[in-house]
């Protein structure tokens, strides 16, 4: 079983405008989507669609927290959240003719007692894999993440920002940086695939068993103990990139839970992301739809190690 922990979940509000945004102008639209969001929650939604046994956890509070719970219940996704006093945040993505704008809140204040309850929740669920995804809310630190990682006999997956990956010092199962997070975590310039390979191998050397790097239109890389694998992105129309990296992690974890190989797990990550970017918001892809393009993703070995 996979337990996803989202310390700082959100209601994702995605708005679409056909015209460029202008200062001082009131822009109106009927094209708006509200979804339950946050990296761990997204992974839970996508992995569940891929027939993985998954439960979503983390901190929720207030009206927006209730929205997240209700939406997960409606989608048939198991959840076991810790209730906190402050409100869950609202994150807004604006898709306009002149680009994509992201407006994120910091999140609620978390108390030490909340972290204690989260650790107890994880222990009660006894997962095989525990994923920590997204930013940390005020009051929670990386030492709390490490405590969560060591609180049970489970594999730890992390999908966090580069500033967090730079500080983590533990033998974790897998991390999933994107290009900018690879750069932030290693202090390297990451522009080419070769740059990404070097940065990902550095993270692997720090103790991650797998480094799964999502590179947007350039696909994804997987660094293992034995080799570096590469999978190209599918040529699809991109509507919204929100949740794309989460989809890569979801496909990987779901495939590993089903006993698939490293190459097939990387392929599943790329396939899942290819479906997610085709719709606005973090809507859940259908497994049958994901597998439609299975033969179109050729995984290659970049190098052996």
UniProtKB/Swiss-Prot annotation:
Residues the entry annotates as binding ATP: 214-219, 245-246
Spans through the membrane: none
Swiss-Prot/TrEMBL keywords: ATP-binding, Kinase, Nucleotide-binding, Transferase
The protein's enzyme class: transferase
EC number in record: 2.7.1.56
Recorded effect of pH on activity: Optimum pH is between 7.5 and 9.
Active-site annotation: 246 (proton acceptor)
Pfam families: PfkB (PF00294)
GO cellular component, one term: cytosol
Induction or repression: Expression is highly up-regulated in presence of fructose.
Deleted gene: phenotype: Loss of growth on fructose. Growth on glucose is not affected.
GO molecular function: 1-phosphofructokinase activity; ATP binding
Catalytic activity, reaction form: beta-D-fructose 1-phosphate + ATP = beta-D-fructose 1,6-bisphosphate + ADP + H(+)
Transferase is among the record's keywords: yes
Keyword Isomerase assigned: no
Subunit: Homodimer.
Function: Catalyzes the ATP-dependent phosphorylation of fructose-l-phosphate to fructose-l,6-bisphosphate. Involved in the utilization of fructose as a sole carbon and energy source.
Family per similarity comment: Belongs to the carbohydrate kinase PfkB family.
Protein name from the UniProt record: 1-phosphofructokinase
Organism from which the protein derives: Haloferax volcanii (strain ATCC 29605 / DSM 3757 / JCM 8879 / NBRC 14742 / NCIMB 2012 / VKM B-1768 / DS2) (Halobacterium volcanii)
């Amino acid at each position: 079983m996979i337990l996803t922990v989202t310390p700082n979940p959100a209601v994702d509000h995605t708005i679409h405008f056909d015209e460029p945004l202008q200062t001082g102008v009131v822009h109106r639209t009927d094209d708006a989507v509200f979804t339950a969001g946050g990296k761990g929650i997204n992974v839970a939604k996508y992995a569940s669609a891929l027939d993985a046994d998954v439960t979503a956890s983390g901190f929720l509070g207030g009206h927006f927290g209730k929205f997240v719970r209700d939406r997960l219940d409606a989608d048939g996704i198991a959840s076991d959240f810790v209730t906190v006093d402050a409100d869950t945040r609202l994150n807004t993505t604006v898709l306009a003719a002149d680009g994509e704008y992201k407006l994120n809140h910091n999140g609620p204040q978390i108390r030490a007692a909340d972290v204690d309850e989260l650790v107890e929740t994880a222990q009660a669920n006894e997962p095989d894999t525990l994923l920590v995804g997204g930013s940390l809310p005020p009051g929670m630190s990386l030492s709390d993440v490490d405590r969560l990682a060591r609180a049970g006999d489970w594999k730890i997956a992390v999908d966090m920002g580069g500033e967090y990956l730079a500080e983590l010092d533990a033998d974790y199962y897998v991390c999933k940086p994107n290009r900018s997070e690879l750069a932030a975590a290693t202090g390297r310039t990451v522009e080419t695939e070769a740059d990404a390979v070097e940065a990902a191998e550095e993270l692997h050397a720090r103790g991650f068993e797998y480094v799964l790097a999502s590179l947007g239109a350039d696909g994804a890389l997987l660094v293992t103990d034995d080799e570096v694998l590469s999978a190209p992105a599918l040529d699809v129309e991109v509507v919204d990139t929100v949740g794309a990296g989460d989809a890569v992690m979801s496909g990987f974890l779901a495939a590993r839970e089903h006993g698939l190989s490293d190459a097939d797990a990387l392929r599943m990550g790329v396939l899942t992301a290819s479906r997610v970017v085709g719709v606005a918001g973090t809507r859940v892809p259908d497994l049958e739809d994901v597998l439609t393009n299975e033969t179109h993703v050729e995984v290659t070995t970049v190098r052996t190690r």
